[in-house]
Amino acid sequence: MPELKIKTEKVEKQLTKEPLVLKTPKEKIDNLGKFYATGKRKNAIARVWLKVGKGKIVVNKKTIAQYFPSETYVKTILQPFVLTKTIDQYDIICTVRGGGISGQKGAILHGISKALDKSAPDFHAILRKGGLLTRDSRVVERKKYGQRKARKKTQFSKR
């Protein structure tokens, strides 16, 4: 019986101590003060680093104008900055792999939006309302055997 008293006293002492405080997980910030996020679209995956700067955007070690041939792609990638009114306030470095140009554009857009959301929580409502934080899960439907494409079938003849 004396052993049981000692154990219960230890437990009571632990319970009377300060309560445990759970640490909130840190946002993805590296040692250089950059916010990190990944974006996905179709088969493309983009890794995006965002830091306070002058508005430079580098994609796979090229400027955004060199990497994307069309100006419309550049405008859609800059959409999160237009919505949050932070054009020329952040520098972006991103690497993107897989997919085509359109999928890569969507992946970068998604990654930038997520990184901006981490940099300032005030932007969350704006980006969510603009539909930039949700991942576009549409992917190409697979081809079925016995058909020409995913939905296209050979011509049917009754007789």
UniProtKB/Swiss-Prot annotation:
One Gene Ontology term of the biological-process aspect is: translation
Concerning InterPro entries, the annotation shows: Ribosomal_Su5_D2-typ_SF, Ribosomal_uS9, Ribosomal_uS9_bac/plastid, Ribosomal_uS9_CS, Ribsml_uS5_D2-typ_fold_subgr
- One Gene Ontology cellular component annotation? cytosolic small ribosomal subunit
The cross-references to Pfam families, in alphabetical order and at most eight, read: Ribosomal_S9
Entries under Gene3D superfamilies matching the protein = 3.30.230.10
Extract one GO molecular function annotation from the record: RNA binding
**Does this UniProt record's set of keywords contain Transmembrane helix?**
no
Report keywords, A-Z: Ribonucleoprotein, Ribosomal protein
- Organism domain of life: Bacteria
PROSITE patterns in the cross-refs: RIBOSOMAL_S9 (PS00360)
What does the similarity note say?
A: Belongs to the universal ribosomal protein uS9 family.
Which protein are we looking at?
Small ribosomal subunit protein uS9
